[in-house]
Amino acid sequence: MVELKMPCASLVGRVLRPGITTVAFMLLLASPRPAQAQIDFSGVWQPVYQEDVPERLAGPALRDYVGLPINDNARQFADSWDPARITLPEEQCRVHVSPYIYRGPTMLRIWEEKDPKTQQLMAIKHYISTYEQTRTIWMDNRPHPGPNAAHTWMGFSTGHYEGDMLVVETTHLKQGWIRRNGLPMSDRATMTEYFVRNGDLMTHTFVLIDPVYLTEALVKSQDFTRSTREIPQQAWIWVCEPVVEVDRPDGEVPAYLPNEHPFKNEFGEQNYLPEAAVRGGAETMYPEFQSTIIEGRRSMTPPKPPPPPAPAAGGAAR
C-alpha cells in the first residue's frame, strides 16, 4: 500500500489561519527531517481532474467570486470583464502565467539539468505544452534578481528540498489571471509551490500572495499522474495564430462600465446566493461564513419552479 503524503491541509492552516495554528505549522515545517535522497520528478505528467472539473475546464460563471480572498480592486477589474475580450488578436495567444497555467488542459514534461563535471543539480526544467512554455527552477542557491529585472510569464523561480518535498519560490511574474472570469493577478504577486510525489501521483500545491488584488493568501492544488505511454509529438505543440474573429473599430476593447454589466445578478439569482457571498472576500473562505449564507437566503425570493409541461395536442395535460 502506498503511503500518501499530503501537505495541503498543513499548508492551508499555515498560510490562512493566524495565531496558534500558524505558529504550530511553521514549527512543523521548520523541524529537522531525516536525511533522504531527493525525489526525482522527471517524466511526463498528465493532469487529473476531480471535483474541480467545472472550475478548470468549463470555467466559472461571470461574477462568481465565492471563496476567494479578493479585495475591491479585484472586484472592480473583474466586474468590467467581457468574455469577448479573448477574441481580440492581441489576446488570443496571450500566455497564461505560471500560477494559472498548470490548472488548464496541458501536458507536463519534467527533467533535471546537472553540472557535467560535478553532477550537481543545477536546475529542474518544466516544459508545459500550453503555449509551449519552458520553465526553469534554479536549484543552485542563486539569489532572485532585483526589483527592476524583467518580468516574464513563468517568472523567476528558485527551489530547494525540504525532506522529500520540492519547495519553489517565484517572483518577477507578469500580470495575469487567477480565474477565467476576469479576476486579475498583479505583477507584484509572488508564489510558493510545494511538489510532492507518491509513486506515479504528483500533488502540486501553490500559495499566491498578491498585495494588489488579494487580502490573504490564495491556496490551490492539483494532481498529476505519470504517463507510461508514448505521447504523440503533436500533443506537445500549441498552434496559435492570431486572426481577426470579430470586426471592430481600431482600439475598441470589449468591456463593461461600472454597474452596467448586464449579467451582474445572474450567478447569485441562479444559485440562490446572497450578494455578500457572490462578491467574495477572505471571510467567504471559512466554514463560519455558512451562517451568513443561510441568513442571506432567508431574505431572498426562492427561485421559481419550472412551468408545467404544455398539454398534448387535442387533450388536457395529465
What name fits each language-model region?
Residues 7-10, 26, 68, 87:
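Helix-centric, low-specificity signal for extended rod-like, repetitive segments
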Residues 13, 17-31:
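Bacterial N-terminal signal peptides
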Residues 1-16:
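N-terminal secretory signal peptides that target proteins for export/translocation
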Residues 2, 34-318:
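PEST-like low-complexity, intrinsically disordered acidic/proline/serine-rich tracts
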